From Swiss-Prot:
Identification of the protein by name: AP-1 complex subunit mu
GO cellular component, one term: clathrin-coated vesicle
Recorded name of the encoding gene: apm1
Location of N-acetylalanine modifications: 2
InterPro entries linked: Adaptor_comp_med_subunit, AP2_Mu_C_sf, AP_mu_sigma_su, Clathrin_mu, Clathrin_mu_CS, Longin-like_dom_sf, MHD
UniProt keyword list: Acetylation, Cytoplasmic vesicle, Golgi apparatus, Membrane, Protein transport, Transport
Intracellular or extracellular location(s): Golgi apparatus, trans-Golgi network; Cytoplasmic vesicle, Clathrin-coated vesicle membrane
Subunit and partners: Adaptor protein complex 1 (AP-1) is a heterotetramer composed of two large adaptins (gamma-type subunit and beta-type subunit), a medium adaptin (mu-type subunit) and a small adaptin (sigma-type subunit).
All residue ranges annotated as the MHD domain in the record: 169-426
UniProt GO molecular function: clathrin adaptor activity
Main subcellular location of this protein, as a coarse class: Golgi
Effect of inactivating the gene: Cells are viable but display a severe growth defect and a delayed developmental cycle. In this mutant, phagocytosis drops by 60%, the protein transport between the TGN and lysosomes is probably defective and the contractile vacuole is lost.
Database matches in CDD domains: AP-1_Mu1_Cterm (cd09250), AP1_Mu_N (cd14835)
Function: Subunit of clathrin-associated adaptor protein complex 1 that plays a role in protein sorting in the trans-Golgi network (TGN) and endosomes. The AP complexes mediate the recruitment of clathrin to membranes and the recognition of sorting signals within the cytosolic tails of transmembrane cargo molecules. Also involved in early steps of phagocytosis and macropinocytosis.
Amino acid sequence: MAASAIFLMDSKGKVLISRNYRGDVPMSVASKFISKILEEEDLNLKPIIQEDGISYIYVKHNNLFLLATTERNANAATILLFLYKMIEVFNEYFKELEEESIRDNFVVIYELMDEMMDFGYPQSTEPKILQEYITQEGYKLERGARGMVLPAAITGAVSWRKEGIKYNKNEVFLDVVESINLLVSANGTVLRSEIVGAVKMKSKLSGMPELRLGLNDKILFENSAKTGAPKGKGVELEDVKFHQCVRLSKFENDRTISFIPPDGEFELMSYRLNTTVKPLIWVECISDTHAHSRVEYMVKAKSQFKGKSIANNVEIIVPVPPDADTPKFRCTVGTCKYAPEKDAIIWTIKQFPGGGREFLMRAHFGLPSISDEKPATKPPIMVKFEIPYYTVSGIQVRYLKIIEKSGYQALPWVRYVCLSGDYQFRTS
């Protein structure tokens, strides 16, 4: 991958800042790019445009265009990722990347562009590392007896972590977070179900520690068969993505997740699991309209997760006709309210025990005497919840080892949480 030049342009195609890294593509091609953009409608726009042997790879952000040009057979995905990393870095520096912040920070942006890319190849794109030596006031480097001294993270192999970090209390927090996307038909059939998971960490560790994370044997990764792992009753995770700190070669060899963590919060890995999921909270709704004068609802909610677990902050959002009025509610647990701005009833249950517990809510609405004869399409019932200490996939952390040359003791904390994602029940 090699980008020839990078341009930051306003919505009309005026170049605000540009940097020519290789000199093999004329800088004047930026005007051709904006002409092509203006010719196309927004729906037809693609992130890559090719013309006269030149590739234009761009991202639109806040009415700005970040454009990379190249005439080589470049890795377009890598260039796109770099442009998004540029946005992330600029947002870290200026809070919001927009035309005004660019005009106010020309010098800093040029310095960042020079450090983030060299001769068209990405270098350091970690905001915390860049902030060590490029500040809002300008470019600052320490000078020692032998001349200029760059921060160690720039010259070392671990670009995402600086040296010399020190904490009085060494701790690492690990959260396994899973969201469930679910769609159930009006007759109770699960049409779509998916688990989207992430392992998030907050590192407060001194020095340059190495961490080793072990997961339970039930969890398999894609292509596990290549390593001779037995499939059996294992759950195979798909679309697994790791933070750049993970040693992929070691993971490919023995499925060990070994890494030197960045300082602070980061996402260690994400994954997806396409499998039939039993709805953790099951909802049934029966509605009855009486002579176009009133409508009544009976909503039943039932837990279908382990009895020892509790779902917190459960919200069941039941759509009602937009012309409904004079609401009346009765529920066996929790509170109900009418949200006219959403045309919905919101049934809130602070704590919903597992083990098959069942609750009931009844609602009554008046309807205008004159109504639209054309039946309106009914939006689905939406459910929101949070179940701590619970994962649907069964993923568990067997161990989290922390190894540092000074030999200090560190406290690892592990939490699990299951959340509702796009969780819907269609109604008849």
